[in-house]
């Protein structure tokens, strides 16, 4: 697996590597699967962040600890706020409690949700009291983290009137926002992102769908260097495909 440790001196002349699904795509589709329970996911990421999110969604306890998983903290905060008449406390590691989440909390509260700080204002841990939103438009500064934007965009189809998100300031990590919109469109949700405006229509149900997460080819870049620096090493990379077949890429002994 891509998470295994490979030491150069212990490598054989031929190695096989299986690539798991993209973490970014996996985390987004997991939230949507919790909203629309007729989504089946193939090739889910094996990353710690995705495992934490998946476990938390399948075991919605009153106290949720995401450890170091930053994406889980942000996506879960938005999702849990929509679960009416339920109360949650979401926390993480000491390092997680130093990572700001104020912009997302302010946006959720401005929509009518109920999210409170338990310690330092602007930072986890949080108390979330699931409720119904009162408004369908929010202004969000987008220069800090695109994950705040994606967190709101992912819950938007479950809201009675959908959601309009007006982005202020420079939009960072725009490709990740585009990814979120693309996934929504792929499962049948009407969502658009034009200039500084995201518009997501309310969606009560979607057609049954089998969602294949793209393999995380970016994680393979480290192994390219390993092959280039190791004599007589061949590496076969297996990529998940819809027909349960695999594509094998055999790298040359030297890339230099």
Regions found by a protein language model. Give the residues of each.
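Aromatic- and glycine-enriched pocket-lining scaffold segments that form the walls
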Residues: 170-183
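Short, conserved phosphate-binding/catalytic loop or strand-edge motifs used
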Residues: 121-132, 198
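Structural motif
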Residues: 3-45, 58-98, 129-172, 201-243
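Active-site-proximal loop->helix
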Residues: 53, 103-107, 130, 180
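Flexible, glycine/charged-enriched surface loops at secondary-structure junctions
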Residues: 115-118, 188-198, 233-240, 254
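Single conserved hydrophobic/aromatic residue that forms the stacking wall/gate
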Residues: 1-6, 248-256
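A generic, well-ordered mixed alpha/beta core segment in the N-terminal half of proteins
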Residues: 86-118, 125-127
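Conserved loop->alpha-helix
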Residues: 53, 244-249
